[in-house]
Amino acid sequence: MIAYPNSANISLFLLRVKTDADDLGNQVLRLVGSKEVVGVTSSITSKEFYQSKETKVLLDFKVSIQAFLYDKSKYVYVPNEDTIYIVERSYQNGMWMELYCSETQLKKEEIEGWNL
């Protein structure tokens, strides 16, 4: 199999999540919308890694998606890993939007309206 540069290698969901209060006043997360996209993952550079350590925001990976697909979602769900990541930083690089992600402790069951 031949791998081509900038070929999509990950399928993920962009999650739009809203913080709300339930009937008892407890804080809950509600899924407002989701969008399935494909992207190109890459490791963060050593410079990005050390900068993230200085700010105490440890980045796990970077994924690039086509910029017009990005809807300012703050969470990313990777079905193959069954993991929810938070988008710590986004950066437009030409036609690509680079999303820098950190793993969260958030579980699907904790988000109301989960339907993925």
Question: Can you say where each PLM-predicted feature lies in the sequence?
Answer:
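Active-site-proximal polar cores
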Residues: 1-28
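Short, conserved turn/kink motifs that form compact alpha/beta structural patches or helix kinks used as
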Residues: 27-116
